C-alpha cells in the first residue's frame, strides 16, 4: 500500500502542466450589428455575458419593429439606455433615456434626438461608439467585469 502511494505521489509530482499557448482573440470576428435590421430585434451596444447592464443606443421605441429599441437603418439616436432585451420580439423594461444636450431646447419632447452618421458608428463586444451631430458629442458605451 505504501509503495503504491509512493509511486502515485512520484508520478503526480513528475507531471508538469501543459505549456500555455497563445490564445487567439476571437472577438475580432464578431459583428455586433448583425440582427439590428429587418426585425432581428438585437442591439449593438455594450454588454457582458449574463451581466445586469446592456447599455445601447435607442433609435426608436414605437411598434414591434423596435423591440430591442435599435434599428440599423435609422439615422436618429433618441438617447441611450442601460437595459435592453435581445432577440425577444417584445418590448419591456421601462427604460429611461440618457442623452447629452446643450443650450435651450424649444421643443423638449423631441429636441433631444440627434442625427448620427453610420460611418462614425462602431461596435465591438463590450464597446459601442457613435458621434452625434447635435450636440457634437462622441458617445462611448462600455461594459466590463
Language-model segments: which ranges?
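Bacterial N-terminal signal peptides
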Residues: 2-10
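Bacterial Sec-dependent signal peptides at the C-terminal "C-region" and cleavage site
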Residues: 11-23
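Accessory carbohydrate-recognition regions in carbohydrate-active enzymes
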Residues: 20-145
